[in-house]
Amino acid sequence: MSSAAASEPLDHAPSPALSRATVDRTGERRTDDAWLAGAWRERGRLLLLDDDYRVLADDVPEKVTGAGIGGERLAGSGPSPALHLLATEGDERPDDAVFLGADDEAAYFARRVDVLPESDGARPALLREVGSALGDRDAGLLVHAVALLTWLDRSVHCPRCGAVTEIRSAGSLRVCPVDGSEHHPAPTRR
């Protein structure tokens, strides 16, 4: 094999199931309160996650195969699951609704709820149950929502002084009110 052939990308290599995303996270918009308010009011879509980080998804088979999940149906055969996104309500974004990003169709937000609402055709599902079968947009939104809300839930206190931090930048930043330190989501290191 020549060195040129070895360095060429493999066109047939699939993307890892949970690394797909089409929504622009638009980091520059996270601190733009006027833009966030307009996006919430005019074209917002809301993803709800319960205390177990389950979401409502439409067309979820009882069993899906892929990413190490056993089942009877192969991902990609039959209708693909889709996240159940709600239209945002009200003029103001609730403080606990985090901004996930935007595309040409909508601005996407997520928030935690104690109990997911009842919905015809949708059932609660975990990321690991549906992630590999979701389309690119929904897979990216769900991975981002679970990661960001998990970080927010587990990083309440300042690691420097122990004070309760304040959520800023539409959920992508925590700031300590005592020492002013900023804390960003970061991957867990083992």
Language-model features and meaning:
Residues M1, L10-H12, L18, F109, ...:
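Aromatic-residue detector
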Residues L85, F99, E105, F109, ...:
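Generic detector of bulky aromatic hydrophobic side chains
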Residues L86-T88, G135-D136, H144, G180-E182:
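Intrinsically disordered, low-complexity segments enriched in polar/charged residues with Gly/Pro
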Residues S2-G135:
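N-terminal alpha-helical interaction blocks
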Residues V143-R190:
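Cys/His-rich short segments
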Residues P117-R160:
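A gly/proline- and charged-residue-enriched helix-loop-helix capping module
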